[in-house]
Amino acid sequence: MCIRDSVWVAYTLTDDNELVIKYQATTNKLTIVNLTNHGFFSIQGIGNPTPTIDNIICEVNADFYLPIDETSIPTGEILKVEGTPFDFRKPKPIGQDINADNEQIKNGSGYDHNYVLNKKEEGELSFAARIKDPVSCRTMEVYTTEPGLQMYTGNFLEGIKGQHGATFPRRSAVCFEAQHFPDSPNRSYFPSVRLKPRETY
């Protein structure tokens, strides 16, 4: 029997300046589902004297993160952020430790790691991250029902063309990818990404 998956994604812009992303998936046979988005956010805006995200103030609601190997795959460990460049529990500039002499920073060429979000209950909609531009005071908050949040700082982007002839340099935007943990199918102790028939993701 062939696997027949049905996937539904809805993007909604609200009058409260929210972007709401909802996913739904069903299957007729056991399969793997771990949906996310890879939107880049450059809240400093075009014309900002500091075009990179180095001065953007960031907060991530996580006590733990997943270290990666040199191919950017999680090693399977779950490590504390405390005392590392990955500690964003208190707001700090993204660029403060992005070039630190740290093996994990080197493996990701910056931040490209999954955070284990602090949750009171599985599946609850809760605060995950916040960024603020200190110049314009623009602020973006991320809430999710997912257990993980991949933070990617545009480490491999260079010279991307944008609106009004603007060119975006390396690390000029950040991604917050709410999801289950990467490599979950190979790690039985990670939150499961298996979807069974008659279940709804």
What residue ranges belong to the model's regions?
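An exposed, glycine/acidic-rich loop-and-rim segment of catalytic or binding clefts
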Residues: 4-201
